[in-house]
Amino acid sequence: MTHAIEVCGLTKSFRADRKALDDVTLHVAPGEMVALLGASGSGKSTLLRHIAGFVTSDAGAGEIVVNGRAVQRHGRLARNVRSVRSEIGFVFQQFNLVGRLPVMTNVLVGMLSRLPKWRSLLRLFKANEIQAGLHALAQVGIDDYAFQRASTLSGGQQQRAAIARTLVQNARVILADEPIASLDPESSRRVMSLLAQINRTRQVAVVVSLHQVDVAMRYCPRVVALRHGKVVYDGPSAALTPDMLRDLYGTEAEELLHDTLDSEPDAVPVPALAGMNIAAA
């Protein structure tokens, strides 16, 4: 079986005496939802950025393949890495939206890799492409804000716009780097529910980095726990207990156990598209 994500023997050193990632091996199946769990500095974000091909591993140390195509090998990016990246949606902690541009423009950026170069440079989108953007925004519940500046949205709404961008991109893999770290509990539930919904309905592989154990257990059937750049647990989230976490993390376990979401996740509304008028060049 071709895995959605294959990471083999990945090592990354930022200093001679410290490995941010230490011989990490990870396989994620298509349609699987996995939580990367760990305290601050455990290597979660570094691992996701390597999978996306934003950074390279140490020379001669590791290989990453996404959807059967190489992202990097032995510290060098693959020649066609841009093409591979077009199938990887990345949701950043700080949203990565351009505040002065409309929400719609920020979302449609997700399809730039599929457009002719001249239209990509000029940001010219056809009516059917804008329709796809509206549909994606409707799926995340913020289509009413499509033509407002992104800076007018709340943090939770901006994160949902970032998720809509991955839908327009038709990403086969979604990597979410601490997507709820700066959000209130209600917005956090909405964002995690959206990621879980996309995972179920589209069978997209989702890997989300978290530092809250209860969130990982609620939304992700599988947890990969990192500590000091090493994988210290890879298995069912339901098997994690406070005592096990204290054994794995020592005093760092309190950071993972402290933050919680207070109530059950709410259903995410999906507004209908009927009656919408679209203007496009």
Swiss-Prot record:
Coiled coil: none
Main location class: membrane
Keyword Zinc carried by entry: no
Molecular functions (GO terms): ABC-type phosphonate transporter activity; ATP binding; ATP hydrolysis activity
Domain ABC transporter: 5-253
Subcellular compartments: Cell inner membrane
Keyword Translocase attached: yes
Subunit structure: The complex is composed of two ATP-binding proteins (PhnC), two transmembrane proteins (PhnE) and a solute-binding protein (PhnD).
Function: Part of the ABC transporter complex PhnCDE involved in phosphonates import. Responsible for energy coupling to the transport system.
InterPro entries the record matches: AAA+_ATPase, ABC_transporter-like_ATP-bd, ABC_transporter-like_CS, ABC_transpr_PhnC, MetN_ABC_transporter-like, P-loop_NTPase
One Pfam family it belongs to: ABC_tran
GO cellular component: plasma membrane
Organism, scientific name: Cupriavidus pinatubonensis (strain JMP 134 / LMG 1197)
Binding-site list for ATP: 38-45
UniProt catalytic activity: phosphonate(out) + ATP + H2O = phosphonate(in) + ADP + phosphate + H(+)
Membrane topology: Peripheral membrane protein
Protein's name according to its UniProt entry: Phosphonates import ATP-binding protein PhnC
